[in-house]
Amino acid sequence: MTLQISAQNVKALRDKTGAGMMDCKKALEASNGNEEKALDSLRQKGLASANKKSGRTAIEGLLESYIHTGGRIGVLVEVNCETDFVARRPEFQKLAKDIAMQIAACPNVEYVSMMHISDETISLEKRIEAGRDDIKDKPAEMIEKIVEGRIKKRLKELSLLDQMFIRNQDITIEDLINQNIALLGENIKIRRFVRFILGGGEENTKANFADEVADILNKK
């Protein structure tokens, strides 16, 4: 039986760490309500204190580029921080490089986060899913539930922050950024990115392209 975590306990942990409410709730559930263990878990994930910095203005940073081996795919990404001092830190520069290589390995990613996806795009995706042959003859209520699940999965595929980090499949890109916020002590944001494909043709001719990029990452 799952332990019920009270809102007061979640708020108390949030006040101590600055982590998000859902992150605090999940940490408390995973630790069976033990606040000390939950706090350690948040610190290990780099989530403690990250949210306290997330509202601060990030206007410095750098533009990072990555050209994949063979020159078939290129990426340009803007990663922002608060000061030029942090922008020059090797840890920040490594983060920007990792993000650029992540984008190269994720052909479906089109947005920084799900919040950037327009209502028009979401509506279009819903219409496409609702009209698929495998569900169009099902009851309306069932179609709605199936479409909702598929849309949630589709939006995650489009969002960079929701991708699993190719160097460490246990964390997302959002987790990676939060870890670096905790490490460097400044707000960090991905502002924008663009992905170029040579000739504008197929994104990838190899099924294991993500693995190919991951191998390069792991050698660095």
Curated annotation (Swiss-Prot):
Pfam family, one: EF_TS
A GO MF term: translation elongation factor activity
Species in which this protein is naturally found: Porphyra purpurea
Record keywords: Chloroplast, Elongation factor, Plastid, Protein biosynthesis
Gene Ontology CC terms, in alphabetical order: chloroplast; mitochondrion
Function in brief: Associates with the EF-Tu.GDP complex and induces the exchange of GDP to GTP. It remains bound to the aminoacyl-tRNA.EF-Tu.GTP complex up to the GTP hydrolysis stage on the ribosome.
Entry superkingdom: Eukaryota
Keyword Protein biosynthesis: yes
InterPro entries, per the entry: EF-Ts_dimer_sf, Transl_elong_EFTs/EF1B, Transl_elong_EFTs/EF1B_dimer, Transl_elong_Ts_CS, UBA-like_sf
UniProt name for this protein: Elongation factor Ts, chloroplastic
Gene name of the record: tsf
Entry similarity comment: Belongs to the EF-Ts family.
HAMAP family the UniProt entry points to: EF_Ts
Keyword presence, Protein biosynthesis: yes
Entry's localization field: Plastid, Chloroplast
